[in-house]
Amino acid sequence: MQGLVFFLTSLLVFVFLFCALLPIASPRMTKPKMATKEVTYTYVALGDSLTEGVGDSTKQGGFVPILAQSLSNENDGQYQPVNYGVAGNTSAQILDRLKKQTDLQKDLKKARVMTLTVGGNDLRKVVVNHLSDFSLSDIQKPLKNYTANLKEIITKARKDNPHLPIYVVGIYNPLYLNFPELTSIQTAVDRWNETTEETIAQFDQVYFVPINDLLYKGIDGKMGVSEISDGKTTVINDALYEEDSFHPNNTGYEKMKQAILEKINATKKTWSQK
C-alpha cells in the first residue's frame, strides 16, 4: 500500500514538473488592420448647358453631381466633380475655353475621367438660321467645322493626360413631340450623332453615349403627356424642363446619368489600371 502511495506521489510530481517545463504559448500575433486611405479622383465635366445643368430644379449641376456620387458609391475612392459647363457654348467656344482656362487645364491634367456635352448649340444655330426652309444640306459645313473642333477638344484635353477616358454625350431632338412633321430635324440629329460617333472612334478610350432615344419621346418613350387648354391640345415632353421644353428636367438628367454610368461600367476595365 505504501508502495502504491509512493508511486502515485512520484507520478504527480513528475507531471507537475513536466508541465512547468513546457513553454507557454504566446498569444497569436495578429496583423493590425491598416487604416485605408481614401483616394480622391477628379472628374472633369466639360461642355454646354447640359453640363451646366440648365433645367435642374436643385441648381446642383444636372447629371454631373449625381454621376460623381454613383461613381463614388460603386468604386474605390471618391470622385470629386468639377463642372466646366457653360450654357449656350458651341464646340468652337468650348475649344476656346480649353485653350485659355488654366484652371481647366490643371484639372484635366489630374483627371481620372471626363464627360463632354457638345454639338447641340452648333446644330441649334443652323436650325434657327434656316427655320422656314431647313434641309440637311444646311448642316454640311457646320458639321464639318464641328468635327474639326471635336477632334481638337479631345486632343487638347489629353495634352498632359494622354490616357484620360472621355465620354462624349450625344445630342437629342427636343422638338419632336410638338413638331413631329419636321422630320428633317430628327434626321439632322441622327446624322450629327452618327458623325460624332464616327469621329471619336479614331481615338483610344473615347466613348459615345447616345441619349436621343432616352429623351425625345418623353419618359419611357411614352410620347409625353397631353394637356388641353382653350380647346387646344399640347403635348408635353415629361423628360424636359417645363420652363423651356428644351433642356432636361431632373428626371431627364437622371436618365442621362444612368446612360453615362452604364457606359463607364461597360468600359472602365480598359482604363481603370492606367
Which sequence ranges carry the predicted segments?
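Serine-esterase "nucleophile elbow" of acetyl-processing enzymes
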Residues: 24-87, 104-106
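Histidine-centered active-site loop/cap adjacent to the catalytic His
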Residues: 232-274
